[in-house]
Amino acid sequence: MIRLDRVNKSFGHLRVLRDVSLNIEKGEVVCIIGPSGAGKSTLLRCINHLEGIDSGTIYLEDEPVYRYERNGKVVVDSERRIEALRSEVSMVFQSFNLFPHLTVLENVMLAPVHVRHEPKEEVRRRAVALLAKVGLSDKIDAYPQELSGGQQQRVAIARSLAMQPKALLFDEVTSALDPELIGEVLRVMRQLAAEGMTMVVVTHEMGFARDVADRVLFMADGVVVEEGPPKQIFTAPRHERTRQFLQTVLERNAEAGVPKDTA
């Protein structure tokens, strides 16, 4: 469904993605783990076309969105086509990005009404159903500042689902939350995975990656170092860099008394 072929991305002299190739099948849950600065979030932003690429090709359902030609130029699809593709691959951010002056319901309805020009009543019915799905039926008239961080993140997930995307990208969506609020967000994500939603998840929640992912990718220094089924990555990683990372994470969690996620 989503395919990257030798994608490269730099910010100035810093190479953030180095010849990254990746194939994500429909209905697959792929979790991306790795240290800070590995290029994980940039990879998601390139898939969602929030960042351009320097070379390589990105495909959505076998249609190239960015492609690199022999003359050294990256050819980008039309902006209109990019917007259409962006609505098919929605992204949920670490910082929620809700509009503070709009109610929860208005935040969820905004893009389908104003970007896709869908009938308002139809969108309203869908938004109400989605807020029920994420456990927020009683908050539809609330404003973001009246919600906890976990509730705001669930609104952000409902907002992404309102565009009826073919895939969802999650960029460390629990990292800004208090520990006791993480579980409520992970429960929603587990439900989406069980329903067959295609998901690419950048996460530090190792329990979620181990239990929910079909495949885990370990990234470091802009490269996919290793990928495989969760059991193989977490119990028998092939690369020393992967082993070092997992050992560090597990030791840090043990010192902090962080329990395995129970979502």
Where are these regions (language model features)?
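Conserved ABC ATPase signature
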Residues: 143-147, 151
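ABC ATPase "signature
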Residues: 227-228
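Short coil-to-helix segment of the ABC ATPase nucleotide-binding domain corresponding to the Q-loop/switch region
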Residues: 102-110
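H-loop/switch region of ABC-family ATPase nucleotide-binding domains
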Residues: 203-204
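A short, proline-enriched helix->beta-strand linker immediately N-terminal to the Walker B motif
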Residues: 162-166
